[in-house]
Amino acid sequence: MSKFQVVEHPLIQHKLSILRRKEASTKEFRELVDEIGMLMAYEVSRDLPLEDVEIETPVQKTTVKQIAGKKLAIVPILRAGIGMVDGILKLIPAARVGHIGMYRDEETLKPVEYLVKLPADIADRQIFLVDPMLATGGSAILAVDSLKKRNAKAENIKFVCLVAAPEGVKALQKAHPDIEIYTAALDEKLNEHGYIVPGLGDAGDRLFGTK
């Protein structure tokens, strides 16, 4: 399986088309990010291992398949990544949630890390690292660096976004060729300000109604 995947499910693509529209309200944008995050989680969790478990139905005992107890952590890159967390938790409510806080220096376009808060057993968990946008790749690279410094295993890290620029994908793959990348769309390019084109604007501002 390729370590880079565009998830082309019709429901995801339909909701993404509405999300991109500039007239989408903060409420609509927030709800759509939540919904697409949940749908992306369905695809990203496709390879979770299963085990046989014996249960009893109202009729008789039987053997069923359940996820094999693999621990999961959802780690949003703040602040926009928070918008994807609740949707994933709807599917996987037992997951732990960590946080990696970053902001982008608007002059250098480089990320600055200000917070890392992770489950103590992060080394033993499969990790969904989430951020709606993969633009230059700087924030994602720094976030994966932070996870690896805290003993997270590369094979357990999956970066999940809604929209990616080719430049960001290339940069993240170069820095961390050992992690998987999932996106709902691979867009055309970055503009001179480091924003994805056509993109969907500033995801954080649109999620939280700020400027």
Curated annotation (Swiss-Prot):
Q: What is the top EC class of this enzyme, as a single word?
A: transferase
Q: Which residues bind uracil?
A: I196, G201, D202, A203
Keywords, A to Z, come to: Allosteric enzyme, Glycosyltransferase, GTP-binding, Magnesium, Nucleotide-binding, Transferase
Q: Which GO terms describe its molecular function?
A: GTP binding; magnesium ion binding; uracil phosphoribosyltransferase activity
The record's Gene Ontology biological-process terms are: UMP salvage; uracil salvage
Regulation of activity is described as: Allosterically activated by GTP.
What remark does the entry make about the cofactor? Binds 1 Mg(2+) ion per subunit. The magnesium is bound as Mg-PRPP.
Q: Where does 5-phospho-alpha-D-ribose 1-diphosphate bind?
A: R79, R104, D131, P132, M133, L134, A135, T136, G137, G138, S139, D202
* Coiled-coil residue spans: none
Give the record's pathway.
Pyrimidine metabolism; UMP biosynthesis via salvage pathway; UMP from uracil: step 1/1
Keyword NAD attached: no
In short, the EC number is 2.4.2.9
Q: Does the keyword GTP-binding apply?
A: yes
Its cofactor is:
Mg(2+)
**Catalysed transformations (reactions):** UMP + diphosphate = 5-phospho-alpha-D-ribose 1-diphosphate + uracil
Similarity section: Belongs to the UPRTase family.
Function according to Swiss-Prot or TrEMBL: Catalyzes the conversion of uracil and 5-phospho-alpha-D-ribose 1-diphosphate (PRPP) to UMP and diphosphate.
* Entry protein name: Uracil phosphoribosyltransferase
